[in-house]
UniProtKB/Swiss-Prot annotation:
UniProt organism field: Oryza sativa subsp. japonica
Protein name per Swiss-Prot or TrEMBL: Malate synthase
GO molecular function, one term: malate synthase activity
Family listed: Belongs to the malate synthase family.
Gene encoding the protein: MS
Catalysed conversion reaction: glyoxylate + acetyl-CoA + H2O = (S)-malate + CoA + H(+)
């Protein structure tokens, strides 16, 4: 005889009023998405979302002025902040005095987090931003990974290799990079609106890990963060408010949280003093985010045919505007008593070619020697294999000192070196070629395909690439097409046009298919990536961020994930 058994209750997240979770339910995720942690995140959203909206509108307003011909400049209204000698940032916490080598990588996969913490670097920056594709699974597993890393319990078993991964005796100090202010989190709704992504990243991590971090590797300070994509000190002011609210709710002292700001937009280079001043109780210095800085240079001057970039490979730190940016950052940080961090070494070991591998390492050594001689206190590496070479360069130059903040050392500190607005805006020089267009397309399409498939940190042609790669590639292609740049095609001049790009995309897609194999090409999202990349490069107006355009393609909603369950 049949019986009508009651349906088992569906698993769902226990959410406070006004919060809805649209991501897939998972018991591990539920331990992160608790009622109290979500209430904390919702409180941040409600207090600061108005200020964030205002800041984003001011960004758009500034871009309209640049499009009309105005140049970025130092703000006359804040000259007293820049010129005042009577203020400094809070003293550097002992736990992060030595930051000579920092390794960066996504907060997920778990094995990668363990390897980075065990890499021998002084700091591991776990990334929720450019190195992570922000799928629901990646974001939540990243939170689980960081909670376990701070607790010292993170492990991973590779069943295929029969290998167990766990933390070593002296793991790197953890910094966390949340997303930029512009990115939403569509799987978390607060009062019916998508949450601000960075406040979800920050809020969940801080809520679950601040106490364990401070009692462990933070030595009564922390947690520590990297803050990306800012364009103005008003955006730093919002972070200041977020930090102060978090400290108050956690019952920890003001200034416990510390953050390094990535100077990776052209407008921000004119706001470095002001950014440090806003965050002076919470500052852990500034970092040269040089790849996104190049992207921002193109975006800022998108309407200016006199600002065309040469091939991406030629836009390095030898360019005057890039060298000036580095020198001003060092001067600013050391004047205010904080770290001036160098840029990324993106090379990865070349296992099957010893000569090529040594040549790549030599390029890294030269770049890092330039940085430490200029006055940088530390630098970034994308792969553990680079760390011994970088440590040798920095430690050899520093001679036992943890940094050179107080040493007045380096090229940037020489008397008479004054960086002007003209220095920071000098157009870069070099050739523009069809091969550059092809390389941008080949790399850009492959990165977008990987990002759509859930990978945000991608090895391509012996470099570890993140979203900055795709951004530089697509904005440079767009710039060349928009202004009809003349490109060198092996001694023949051709004009950049949509028709030329269409031919290049066709050829490069075939090349990528040959490189990765027909089956992987078919199963991957290469065709979709090619369409997105082509559309971005030929759009009448330049989109602010490629990742905003592509984000909806990785959002997967599960409407019954929040309480009360919807049966």
């Amino acid at each position: 005889m049949a019986t009508n058994a009651a349906a088992p209750p569906c698993p769902c997240y226990d959410t406070p009023e006004g919060v809805d979770i649209l991501g897939r339910y998972d018991p591990e995720f539920a331990a992160i998405l608790t009622r109290d942690s979500l209430a904390f995140v919702a409180g941040l959203q409600r207090e600061f979302r108005g200020a964030v909206r205002y800041a984003m509108e001011r960004r758009r307003e500034a871009q309209r002025r640049y499009d009309a011909g105005e140049l970025p400049r130092f703000d006359p209204a804040t000259r007293p902040v820049r010129e005042a000698g009577g203020w400094a940032c809070a003293p550097v916490p002992p736990a992060i005095a030595d930051r000579t080598v920092e390794i960066t990588g996504p907060a997920e996969p778990r094995k990668m987090v363990i390897n980075a913490l065990n890499s021998g670097a002084k700091v591991f920056m776990a990334d929720f931003e450019d190195a992570l594709s922000p799928t629901w699974e990646n974001l939540m597993r990243g939170q689980v990974n960081l909670r376990d890393a701070v607790a010292g319990t993170i492990t991973y078993r590779d069943a295929a290799r029969g290998r167990e991964y766990r933390l070593g005796d002296r793991p790197a100090t953890l910094f966390v990079r949340p997303r930029g202010w512009h990115l939403p989190e569509a799987h978390v709704l607060v009062d019916g609106e998508p949450a601000i992504g960075c406040l979800v990243d920050f809020g969940l991590y801080f809520f679950h890990s601040h106490a364990a971090f401070r009692s462990g590797q933070g030595a009564d300070f922390g947690p520590f963060f990297y803050l990306p994509k800012m364009e103005h000190s008003r955006e730093a002011r919002i972070w200041k408010g977020v930090f102060e609210r978090a400290e108050k709710e956690a019952g920890i002292g003001r200034g416990s949280i510390r953050a390094t700001v990535l100077v990776e937009t052209l407008p921000a280079v004119f706001q470095m003093e002001e950014i440090l001043h806003e965050l002076r109780d919470h500052s852990a210095g500034l970092n040269c985010g040089r790849w996104d800085y190049i992207f921002s240079y193109v975006k800022t001057f998108r309407a200016r045919p006199d600002r065309l970039l040469p091939d991406r490979a030629l836009v390095g730190m030898a360019q005057h505007f890039m060298r000036s940016y580095s020198h001003l950052l060092i001067q600013t940080c050391h004047r205010r008593g904080v770290h001036a961090m160098g840029g990324m070494a993106a090379q990865i070991p070349i296992k099957d070619d010893a000569a090529a591998n040594e040549a790549a390492l030599e390029l890294v050594r030269k770049d890092k020697l330039r940085e430490v001689r200029a006055g940088h206190d530390g630098t970034w590496a994308a792969h553990p294999g680079l760390i011994p070479a970088i440590r040798e360069v920095f430690e050899g130059h520093l001679g036992g000192r943890p940094n050179q903040i107080d040493a007045a050392a380096g090229d940037a500190a020489r008397a008479g070196v004054a960086v002007t607005e003209e220095d920071l805006l000098q157009p870069p020089r070099g050739a523009r070629t069809v091969e550059g267009l092809r390389h941008n397309t080949r790399v850009g399409v492959q990165y977008v395909a990987a990002w759509l498939s859930g990978s945000g940190s991608v090895p391509l042609y012996n470099l570890m690439e993140d979203a900055a790669t795709a951004e530089i590639s697509r904005v440079q292609n767009w710039q060349w097409l928009r202004h009809g740049a003349v490109l060198d095609a092996g001694g023949v001049e051709v004009r950049a046009t949509p028709e030329l790009l269409a031919r290049v995309v066709e050829v490069e897609m075939a090349r990528v298919e040959a490189e990765v194999g027909a089956e992987r090409f078919r199963r991957g999202r290469y065709a979709e990536a090619g369409r997105i990349f082509s559309r971005q490069c030929t759009a009448p107006e330049l989109d602010d961020f490629l990742t905003l355009d592509a984000y909806n393609l990785i959002v997967v909603h599960h409407p019954g994930a929040s309480s009360p369950c919807k049966l």
